[in-house]
Amino acid sequence: PADPVPGDVDPVPAGQVGNRWFRVRRRILATCAIAVVLGLGYYFVSLAQVWITGRADDDGPVDAIVVMGAAQYDGRPSPQLAARLDHVVELWPQGIAPIVVVTGGNIPGDRFTEAEASATYLAERGVPLDALLHENDGSTSYESVEAVADLLAARGLDEVLIVTDPYHALRSRLIAEEVGLDARVSSTDTSVVTGGESLRRHLQEA
């Protein structure tokens, strides 16, 4: 037989090419599947944290109770905000803290801030005016909690109990910890965010 010409390469049988491509494709699919499983696992762990934190009721002694703002209508708290404030009214007689910080600014055209509406509501229900601190400028949870941290730091305080809706508890606590507060949460159990809307917001927070 003739000697092979240098550089000539025997063609790879079609079956072997197909097998190689099958193995490569299988590895790609396996890698994608692992990534999806890990991603879903991380998401469901986060969702569990949102759910568990939202059901916490850590009402030990702190420097201040911080109630997160929500919508108000010309000085009247929305049902969502009123539920949070009612929880503060329940906590106040327990002597958990000597101060309540009300939070939240307003939108253009509003005569009152969320903090002002909250303060009026609490004062009408027995929380002394001189126990109320106002954070009137925040338009997001982060802005409000950051401003609260500054207000309390000026008084040498940093331990807080955050009152909010269950779905909002974990995010509020994490923000508070990020800005230097020693934070715990006590979620309202009379939230008007229920059923499918509550589930949607829990999923969104995760």
Describe each PLM feature range.
Residues P1-D3, Q16:
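N-terminal targeting leader peptides, primarily classical Sec-type signal peptides for secretion
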Residues D3, G7, L47-R200:
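A structural signal for short, hydrophobic/glycine-enriched beta-strand patches
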Residues P11, G15-D57:
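N-terminal type II signal-anchor transmembrane helix
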Residues H202-A206:
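Short, intrinsically disordered, charge-balanced linker/junction segments flanking boundaries
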